[in-house]
């Protein structure tokens, strides 16, 4: 198409999202290798691409426009590796007073991600030889924790804790459409609101959520979340377990099932039993609730159960499938 290409180099997905957002790009492509190669399309703000953008890209490929593009239309690839330094500065800004007196260890299956995480904590004055274990997801977008007592705290509860303190400070949050429903109840308690952006919106119904999310990049960046979590521990002088006591106990279980009919048909039949969402339906049950979302392709249905314990959430999924 003759578009200019900016190359961010070898980065985590979270770094790529930062680069797309910081540089105000319309679209970004994150390419991963390994046993299964993947190309992920990011839209404005480093958020999931919209359906119109996907259709536009599909049209370019279907029409073979890249084949007909003259050689003179191809621009030199711009080396944007320097954005990684700007990303590091953004990480440091998450803890303007440093992390001296705090201890935590970094862990990630991606060695580069672990090195970056540990280096960031160390430069901020954090003791990285002991303390809670901060697990960064391989793509860099999520954070989970094993506290000093050995209890594993999943990403969803860490996200809920971070959102809670945003509510306490009088701010709304923007989260993915499949984020825990418990966070909405927490927001109501403080007179705040949770805006949700879709995985692949067909229109601009989630535009406000996307606008807010562009200013809350740390909620979808595991390293930023980790740094801000440690800042919270330092500022309050409380342990992670004490902070989490303010978050309602909940657990989530996700399942994907293949249907013999269209997911849309099933959701239509369940329409009267639940509350419609922008991209699915939420069914309330005595012991929790289930979020049902159709897949973008095929006849797969994604089920997210949320309840007080993983066992109850698993039972909710089983009862629905029966």
Predicted regions and their residues:
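N-terminal small/polar loop signature for handling phosphorylated ligands or for N-terminal nucleophile
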Residues: 1-39, 117-152
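Short, surface-exposed connector motifs at secondary-structure boundaries
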Residues: 2, 96-104, 166-172, 190
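Conserved beta-strand elements of the Class I
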Residues: 27, 103-105, 132-134, 174, ...
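Structural motif
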Residues: 32, 107-111, 175-178
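Gly/Ser/Thr-enriched, mixed-charge loops and adjacent short helices
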Residues: 36-131, 148
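Glycine-rich phosphate-binding loop plus the immediately following alpha-helix
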Residues: 47-70, 158-190
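Phosphate-binding and adjacent anionic-ligand microenvironments
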Residues: 139-141, 146-151, 155, 165-322
């Amino acid at each position: 198409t003759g578009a200019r290409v900016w190359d961010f180099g070898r980065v985590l997905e979270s770094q790529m999202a930062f680069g797309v957002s910081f540089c105000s790009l319309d679209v970004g492509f994150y390419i991963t290798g390994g046993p299964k190669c993947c190309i992920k399309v990011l839209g404005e703000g480093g958020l999931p691409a919209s359906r119109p953008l996907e259709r536009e890209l599909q049209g370019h490929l279907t029409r073979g426009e890249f084949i007909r593009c003259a050689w003179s239309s191809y621009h030199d690839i711009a080396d944007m590796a320097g954005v990684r330094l700007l990303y590091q500065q953004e990480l440091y800004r998450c803890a303007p007073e440093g992390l001296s007196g705090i201890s935590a260890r970094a862990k990630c299956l991606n060695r580069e991600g672990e090195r970056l995480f540990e280096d960031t904590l160390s430069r901020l004055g954090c003791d990285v030889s002991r303390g809670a274990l901060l697990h960064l997801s391989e793509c860099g977008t999520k954070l989970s924790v094993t506290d000093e007592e050995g209890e594993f705290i999943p990403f969803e509860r860490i996200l809920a804790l971070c959102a809670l303190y945003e509510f306490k400070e009088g701010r709304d949050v923007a989260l993915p459409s499949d984020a825990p429903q418990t966070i909405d109840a927490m927001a109501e308690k403080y007179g705040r609101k949770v805006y949700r952006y879709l995985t692949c919106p067909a229109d601009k119904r989630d535009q406000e959520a996307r606008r807010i999310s562009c200013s809350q990049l740390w909620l979808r960046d595991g390293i930023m979340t980790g740094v801000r979590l440690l800042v919270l521990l330092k500022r309050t002088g409380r342990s992670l377990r004490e902070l989490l006591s303010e978050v309602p106990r909940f657990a989530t279980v996700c399942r994907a099932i293949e249907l013999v009919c269209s997911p849309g048909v099933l959701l239509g039949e369940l329409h009267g039993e639940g509350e419609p969402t922008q991209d699915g339906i939420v069914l309330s049950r005595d012991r929790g609730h289930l979020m049902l979302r159709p897949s973008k392709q095929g006849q797969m249905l994604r089920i997210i159960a949320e309840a007080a314990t993983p066992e109850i959430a698993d039972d909710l999924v089983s009862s629905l499938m029966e």
